[in-house]
Amino acid sequence: MSPRARVIGLECLRCRAVYREQRLFSGCPGCAREGVPVNLTVALDLAPLQGLRPERLSTTSRGLWRFADVLPVAGERAVSLGEGATPLIHLERLGCRLGLRRLYAKDESQNPTWSYKDRLCSVAVTHAVEVGARVITIASTGNHGASTAAYSARVGLPCVIFTLASAPDTMKTLMQVYGAAVVACPTPESRWALMRQGIERLGWYPTSGFLIPPIGSNPYGIEGYKTIAYEIAEEFEWGAPDIVVVPSAYSDGLFGIWKGWTELHALGFIKTLPRMIAAEPFGPLTNALERGLDVPERVMGGQSVALSIASPYGTYQGLTALKASGGTGVRITDEGILEAQRALAREEGMFAEPSSAAALTAVMQLASQKRLDPEQTIVMVITSTGLKDPGASRPWLPPVPAAPDDFAGLLAVLQERYGLALDR
């Protein structure tokens, strides 16, 4: 049997108190009494892995579960659909245009339910089975809900999803097709309130957060995001990029990926740590950094094409990742998001949902402000596919023209509608 990290308990990110309770999903009780909402993280003893060569860490399993020895659940009982092992793609054309020759995309749209949420849900549902959960629940407008539904179906557990009436129909279909019971609520706050009652009254197992203000998701599930860092490091022959850009709302991915980098560094597998950058429509983390806040405050929200990350709330875990890495947040606009979505599709053949294209929006913005070194290695996490919300792309797509009867007419239409001069 290979050595593996040992679970100590759940640790508060702020006061560092450690709790042994395995089903503590409402954050740190001590900090909550002080009025500070803080998520917990799984405290791991990495000592059994010290001295290992990095290639010894990855097991014979495939995908995410190759790194079971640094996860808080037993790999031999993994609830898996083949998540992980997603490609790291060098964006040469976009990089050339932006003056960033080492620009990469970690394409998480190639996971089983087409988003990086599968990493969280695989680990969270595995833990749910370990602790004997009977019902799984989540509040989600799409990716997280679809993934939770799929992994619940994998083990035959009922799944109750609280979504919003405004969620795209495609997302609602994805959640229902896996057999989940989906109900639409008028506001995020109302769905969290109902979900919390299911957790506290009936012991439902949550894969997402359910508190107001939010603290983030299930701490065990967040551990799944660490494997993104492990996979990127392996692609770079056990090195780290200079910058990692993550679309962020409650910052589960941002924090989880950052935690992966800190573990790799603690184990001696990488020599340097990357800066983390959060791309966010309303900028609660950006605001907290600008004002020197210890805890993010709620900012003015509104509508955004990037529905999955359109939150006026930031979290302590997200701010922790940015501060610890010397990173930053970037406020982005719908116009910039759609421009980035189009650029990824037209120049690199990658159809990202608006919330995923937000990562490129942040890079384009920073590049235009001369805040990026052209020689730096930059990795953007493309969190999900544009097929989840195809309607969001319509503003930059022309109507499909009818084909003329004659070839000369066809060439004229191609020139007029698509700008293609193909007659020579």
What are these regions, as identified by a protein language model?
Residues 1-424:
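PLP-dependent amino-acid enzyme catalytic core
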